[in-house]
Amino acid sequence: MAAAVGRLLRASVARGVSAIPWGISATAALRPAACGRTSLTNLLCSGSSQAKLFSTSSSYHAPAVTQHAPYFKGTAVVNGEFKDLSLDDFKGKYLVLFFYPLDFTFVCPTEIVAFSDKANEFHDVNCEVVAVSVDSHFSHLAWINTPRKNGGLGHMNIALLSDLTKQISRDYGVLLEGSGLALRGLFIIDPNGVIKHLSVNDLPVGRSVEETLRLVKAFQYVETHGEVCPANWTPDSPTIKPNPAASKEYFQKVNQ
């Protein structure tokens, strides 16, 4: 009887392994391929256009700039503790919500650490930063507790939100349905919950924290002063009065 049960269990496990995404065995997922990469490395390094499993087919529509951000709610790791987090928690503040593919990967920790290290500069302009992936909050915490020299995150000054059901990634239009990973989507949401900026990178390329902070400051400047920000604007550079006559002041200044 025990032998029969054992055979059934082994057969069940074998069927489960054969259904693993990427179409490989569990051990093969961690074993270097002939080219010197793991299969997961291939996914994250080759980009979505290189793999058939990166299907973006979905019945959901990606949100657009000027539209209200889709509502979200989930469990996050905040200051080393589990905490419920939702879009409502950021009313009256700017929010940078950025998605990344997976914990314990390669480009992702560089982005998250960079945003965390700049958290105070975002706070100075009334802006919070939240990172999101399809991993569990337990995985987030384990990654935070891993030293940075070993590819971990270490102490975090930003929240890491779990999207284990993938619904948040799907609602924001960044989920790759075939692989179940999120593209590197970044959304700047204003204090009224309106999307002011969005960008989406393919998996192998990280984002600029400095550019994100510059954009937040630019949107805030426009709201406060009623003038518009030209290319490469920084807080100490001139802006443009948005009408034909007054705008000449700017163009004459920069084209002397």
Swiss-Prot record:
In the UniProt record, does the keyword Oxidoreductase occur?
A: yes
Q: According to its record, what are the GO cellular component terms?
A: cytosol; early endosome; mitochondrion
Q: What is the superkingdom listed in this entry's lineage? A: Eukaryota
One Pfam family from the record:
1-cysPrx_C
Instruction: Provide the positions where the record notes the PTM N6-succinyllysine.
Output: 83, 91
* One of the record's GO molecular function terms: thioredoxin peroxidase activity
**Which residues carry out catalysis?**
108
> Mainly resides where?
mitochondrion
PTM N6-acetyllysine: list the residues.
91
What residues bear Phosphothreonine in this entry?
Answer: 146
Q: Which residues are the transit peptide here? A: 1-61
Q: Give the record's GO biological process terms.
A: cell redox homeostasis; cellular response to stress; hydrogen peroxide catabolic process; response to oxidative stress
Q: Where in the cell is it found?
A: Mitochondrion; Cytoplasm; Early endosome
Outline the extent of the Thioredoxin domain: 63-221
Record PTM: Phosphorylated by LRRK2; phosphorylation reduces perodixase activity. The enzyme can be inactivated by further oxidation of the cysteine sulfenic acid (C(P)-SOH) to sulphinic acid (C(P)-SO2H) and sulphonic acid (C(P)-SO3H) instead of its condensation to a disulfide bond.
- Keywords for this protein: Acetylation, Antioxidant, Cytoplasm, Disulfide bond, Endosome, Lipoprotein, Mitochondrion, Oxidoreductase, Palmitate, Peroxidase, Phosphoprotein, Redox-active center, Transit peptide
Q: Tell whether Mitochondrion is among the UniProt keywords.
A: yes
Q: Catalytic activity, per the record? A: a hydroperoxide + [thioredoxin]-dithiol = an alcohol + [thioredoxin]-disulfide + H2O
Family annotation (SUPFAM superfamilies): Thioredoxin-like
Function, in words: Thiol-specific peroxidase that catalyzes the reduction of hydrogen peroxide and organic hydroperoxides to water and alcohols, respectively. Plays a role in cell protection against oxidative stress by detoxifying peroxides. Acts synergistically with MAP3K13 to regulate the activation of NF-kappa-B in the cytosol. Required for the maintenance of physical strength.
Q: Which PANTHER family match?
A: THIOREDOXIN PEROXIDASE (PTHR10681), THIOREDOXIN-DEPENDENT PEROXIDE REDUCTASE, MITOCHONDRIAL (PTHR10681:SF128)
The UniProt entry's sequence similarity note says:
Belongs to the peroxiredoxin family. AhpC/Prx1 subfamily.
Task: State the oligomer form and interacting partners.
Answer: Homodimer; disulfide-linked, upon oxidation. 6 homodimers assemble to form a ring-like dodecamer. Interacts with NEK6. Interacts with LRRK2. Interacts with MAP3K13. Interacts with RPS6KC1 (via PX domain).
Spell out the note in the miscellaneous section.
The active site is a conserved redox-active cysteine residue, the peroxidatic cysteine (C(P)), which makes the nucleophilic attack on the peroxide substrate. The peroxide oxidizes the C(P)-SH to cysteine sulfenic acid (C(P)-SOH), which then reacts with another cysteine residue, the resolving cysteine (C(R)), to form a disulfide bridge. The disulfide is subsequently reduced by an appropriate electron donor to complete the catalytic cycle. In this typical 2-Cys peroxiredoxin, C(R) is provided by the other dimeric subunit to form an intersubunit disulfide.
Any idea what this protein is called? Thioredoxin-dependent peroxide reductase, mitochondrial
Name the source organism: Pongo abelii (Sumatran orangutan)
